[in-house]
Amino acid sequence: MEQDLREAVLRESLPQDAEQLKGLWCDVFGDPPELVDAFLSLLAGMGCGCVAEHDGRILGAAYLIHGFTLLQPGKAPLRCGYLYAVAVRPEARGRGLGAAVSHWAAELCRFHGAELICTLPAEESLYRWYGEILSLTHTSTRKVFSRDALPAGVQPLEASEYLRRREALLCGIPHVLPNEAVMDFEAALCRISGGGLYALDDMIFFAYPDKGRWVIPELLPLSAAGRIPGLNTEVLPYLCADRPLPEGLVWNLTFD
């Protein structure tokens, strides 16, 4: 028998929601409980959650990460929001809960001071969906490097040291600065997946193994991609060139 969800309540998540949120996340995304525990333990420092609740049961959730700041030379910093991990229980899908929690999360993000909101949809088909419900424009350019093995000589980095070096390497380049809690979660995500944050000479990157290869979502400085042999991708020309990024492009960081 189909539930009548018209009386579902949208609200900000509370600490006592942790077990239900963890169960929903694991059921929908299949991630290990350790990863969800790490995320929820850091959430207060990164942002907050939005839930759709019906009769005491959480049927949908979305998270807004507002621990990002857009830095552009000559311009005032902008607080950024990142919509993350939108999930709805299978039995409650098709009735607008995903759109409702996403829209409410975006509004909550603005309430917390975000002047710019972005997201990284899990599937190509979702770009249009997010564009319609949140009035977002598809503007991303993205390359993920991969390699059979990490190069010799890499050294692990703590999140705080990675963040310090990252800021030095991106000085003068339009980029998004994560706060320490966001960087801690990025480190936890990589560590739980079998990887981490690394340095090699003057380069920094984070990486994790996936299906027999090492995935490298971020690699700095911008010229570093041409200095590590074995990357199995056609690197965008400006990543290997000694020249500025194209006008309007911002170096971002996302949770993969």
What does each of the following model-derived ranges do?
Residues 136-217:
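Amide-forming acyltransferase catalytic core, primarily the GNAT-like/NAT-type
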Residues 85-88, 94-109, 222-232:
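Conserved acetyl-CoA-binding loop-helix of GNAT-fold acetyltransferases
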Residues 102, 109-122, 232-241:
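Conserved GNAT acetyl-CoA-binding A-motif
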Residues 131-153, 211-256:
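Active-site/acyl-donor-binding loops of N-acyltransferases
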Residues 18, 23-73, 171-197:
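Active-site rim helix/loop that mediates acceptor-substrate recognition in acyltransferases
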Residues 105, 114-143:
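Long, hydrophobic, well-ordered secondary-structure blocks that form the structural core
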Residues 1-16, 148-159:
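Conserved N-terminal entry element of GNAT/NAT acetyltransferase domains
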Residues 51, 57-67, 80-87, 118, ...:
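Conserved beta-strand in the GNAT
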